[in-house]
């Protein structure tokens, strides 16, 4: 009888684990890299979980809207939050960037859990008010589950997030904010399923373009 109970307990555990794996969303093939002054952070998207959110954020990335933006909030063990690009950037936006940045997306809430590395949209009380600000989870936050739209996760750069967690902070209202600006110097994107040679050439061009944006910004600032 004891062996039978052990057998059925093992089967039950296997079924539970199978369902847990099945519920984990699959990442799409697109990858985005934020180059910060503390290191790179790469992330991917969950198009099957939040398709409209993914489309919106990825378009902002492709337009270069996150370049010269920053992380306005770093709460150790909780979130590192990217500022809204309208008002968060140091560089002015062109008309196309501003048009996309001022859009909001519907709240695509899901059963995906808020755990470390997850990307989750920021918003106001209105569930459909998410725009361009989003958080990278620095720990488990079950109280956010089903309340904020999850659209992707960090795929590389956890060591950079850990650096951010150790930076000096100050408290302003409910927010824990870094004392010094954590800049997103530039950004680029690539596709892990693309043709290797062509994708590498395209990736190199985007990285060079992203670097040029930051170089030009510093040139204008330091050598007027």
For each of these PLM feature ranges, what is it?
Residues 9-18:
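Bacterial N-terminal signal peptides
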């Amino acid at each position: 009888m004891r062996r039978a109970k052990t057998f059925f307990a093992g089967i039950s555990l296997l079924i539970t684990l199978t369902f847990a794996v099945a519920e984990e969303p699959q990442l799409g093939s697109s990858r985005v890299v934020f180059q910060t002054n503390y290191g790179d952070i790469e992330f991917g998207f969950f198009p099957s979980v939040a398709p409209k959110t993914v489309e919106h954020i990825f378009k902002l990335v492709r337009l270069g809207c996150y370049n010269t933006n920053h992380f306005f909030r770093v709460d150790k063990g909780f979130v590192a939050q990217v500022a809204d690009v309208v008002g968060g950037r140091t560089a002015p936006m062109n008309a196309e960037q501003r048009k996309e940045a001022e859009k909001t997306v519907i709240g695509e809430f899901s059963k995906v859990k808020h755990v470390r590395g997850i990307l989750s949209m920021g918003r106001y009380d209105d569930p459909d008010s998410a725009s361009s600000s989003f958080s990278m989870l620095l720990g488990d936050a079950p109280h956010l589950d089903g309340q904020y739209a999850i659209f992707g996760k960090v795929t590389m750069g956890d060591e950079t997030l850990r650096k951010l967690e150790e930076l000096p902070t100050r408290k302003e209202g409910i927010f824990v904010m870094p004392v010094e600006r954590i800049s997103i110097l530039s950004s680029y994107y690539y596709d892990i399923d693309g043709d290797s040679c062509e994708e590498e050439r395209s990736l190199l061009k985007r990285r060079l373009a992203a670097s040029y944006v930051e170089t030009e910004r510093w040139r204008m600032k330091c050598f007027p």
